[in-house]
Amino acid sequence: MAKVEFDFEQIQDVPTFYRDFAHKFALDEGFGANLDALWDVVTGDIGLPVEIEFTHLNARSKRRFGAIILLFEEAEEELEGGLRFNIRESSGEPAHHRG
């Protein structure tokens, strides 16, 4: 299973997350950089299986990126093993793993 990590020490805002996501998954410039486009890509366009891990996510970042986190949690359920989504807090300890 491929693993793709998003380091929130380097991602300060939502537009930066979308740019990083598009780069890591080699999406073309037509990627909409919004929740609907992200859902479409995650559930239909990226190679599965894949593990996506958010690292260095503090409480403030969890609030800022809450909708994106929820999207990945829902996609993890929908894809039934095709996607594993994890969050590691700033301490390095796993904060979330359901897969």
What annotation goes with each model-predicted range?
Residues 1-99:
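Positively charged, polar, low-complexity stretches
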